[in-house]
Amino acid sequence: MTGDRPTGKLHLGHYVGSLKRRVELQNSGEYDEIYIMIADAQALTDNADNPDKVRNNIIEVALDYLSCGLDPAKSNIFIQSQVPELTELAFYYMNLVTVSRLQRNPTVKSEIQMRNFEASIPVGFFTYPISQASDITAFKATTVPVGEDQKPMIEQTVEIVRRFNSVYGEVLVEPEVLLPQNAACLRLPGTDGKAKMSKSLGNCIYLSDSAEDVRKKVMGMFTDPNHLKVSDPGKVEGNCVFTYLNAFSKPEHFAKYLPEYASLDELKEHYRCGGLGDVKCKKLLIAVLEEELAPIRARRREFEQNIEGVYEMLRKGSQVAQAKAARTLMEVKDAMRINYFQDKELIARQAEAYRECK
């Protein structure tokens, strides 16, 4: 089980962080059920005054999912707000988490700083780790593929699962986090060298960007500020071009585009020694990214011709997700002893007790 907030089109950071892996897992045949959530309710926690932003980006995220290879026949794609059971589960889980524990969550802390929420944090945003725990546990997820920055969220979910099972009995499944295999994909920086891609910072390469947009963004990408001349020795560490090449390049790319280099390691060594310009490295990256993005772009154009069909896919996916979440919610309420109308023994016992009083 995994998902994304619909606050904009998905970018390369999403792609290498978890999206590409989702497609691989989907096609591996290892999982009986796969749930991919468009987290609109979570997106509203810091966009409450701009619901149209979330509303309009539902379709963008869905198109990105489909164009990357997520298949509704194998992966159940749904919209979070259309599964109300998730909200009810989160409400019960709130009793199992302290305010101080939420404050210590490093992901929450960094997100609060990034959004300048220091003095006025919306309650919904502050508690979104609990909401994520609800999303994961509702589907009895065993595996959650995410980027490195979301690892604390899964740890929080595990704590909630253990606490619930300890208090009420073994009902919830403890999930495991699945990080990207390539260390370079743990977190892809923005094109400006900032730690994270962000639409507001304008440092993203979107999956739906045209070839020309990708070319312009790569040519303007942050490199080594001290590498002023081709002859200057360059620094590979912290250099966005090489970070992206780490994530996307394959050995065959060098034979195809830069046959004078046997591998990325050779290219790096030449750059470190001097005599290799940034433009040559950037042109390689442009070619590598185009190989990855061209088929995604083409598939997106096809799905864009059937928006009605995409929404129908989301509607059906949400129905399947709701049925699954409803079963988990019933188990949770049974364990918590708040299943009053289903507990015939309780009703009969209390009725008998009052009859005896007469």
Task: Give residue spans per PLM region.
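Internal, conserved structured core segments that host functional sites
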Residues: 106-110, 114-164, 168, 189-190
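N-terminal Rossmann-like or analogous alpha/beta NTP/dinucleotide-binding catalytic cores
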Residues: 1-134, 252, 291-293, 297, ...
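A generic structural motif
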Residues: 6, 144-145, 203
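Conserved nucleotide- and phosphate/pyrophosphate-binding catalytic cores
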Residues: 152, 158-358
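Short, polar/flexible loop-turn hinges at active-site or ligand-entry regions and domain interfaces
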Residues: 49-52, 144-147, 171
